[in-house]
Amino acid sequence: MPAFARTIGIDYSGAETPTASLKGLRVYLTEGGAVSTEVPPPPSLRKYWTRRGIAEWLVERLAEDVPTLVGIDHGFSFPLRYFEVHGLLPDWPAFLDDFQRHWPTDEDHTYVDFIRDGSFGHGAARQGNARWQRLTEQRAGGAKSVFHFDVQGSVAKSTHAGIPGLRFLRQRLGPRVHFWPFDGWEVPSGRSAIAEVYPALWSRGFARDGRTSDQHDAFSIATWLAMADRDGSLATFLRPRLSAPERTVAQVEGWILGLAGALDSSGTASMVEDRGAGNSLH
């Protein structure tokens, strides 16, 4: 029996400000075994979602008594090296507060680049290095550092924009939502959960069907999460094959849901098997 009644896939964007209407922000939802469908933003003058709008919508959805698994495609934390360099305790909730104080990317009229160039915030006191990678990025093979800005496929800007949003969700929802794996590798029965995902693991396995790349990434997230939940494989990916020390690190740095954890002969972590195009939830 599936653990979650619905899944939500979010293709994120760190462009512009928290209230900017962004074409790259896309949300798909899967419920009741049906095909994933796009969720439009609430009626307003804005054509597309805003980061703040998505956060507020998630608060409403996750406050409902419907076990929901949400996958968001930006980094949820930083490499352990970052904590060491800046003298921070390896504590994720404390990290969220500290990061938002220095990188208040959730504030009105604030671009990530405003903080990068020193015109706002205190980002200079909390810098990272593009050579620093989390364990999960090393195992993913191809995933870029959360500090690797200004390159194709970078998640740095979306990560720096998105982490304060996670803090907002945690403050508003409290224990109602399980932030995986920071709150533990096991998601309590009946609880909703939010996890970091990497849609490149799955997107090639589904037919594009006229969707834009952003739409397809969000569709792939929601669809794969629902399929994995229904066929029982999700439980395996929620418990990746990591040593005890690796698990300790990953509960600070975070982990990409969909990576099994153990290295294969090529030095890359085992990943979800590629599901053929045209598969459905039925």
Predicted regions and their residues:
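RNase H-like (RuvC/DEDD) metal-dependent nuclease/polynucleotide-processing core
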Residues: M1-I8, Y12-H282
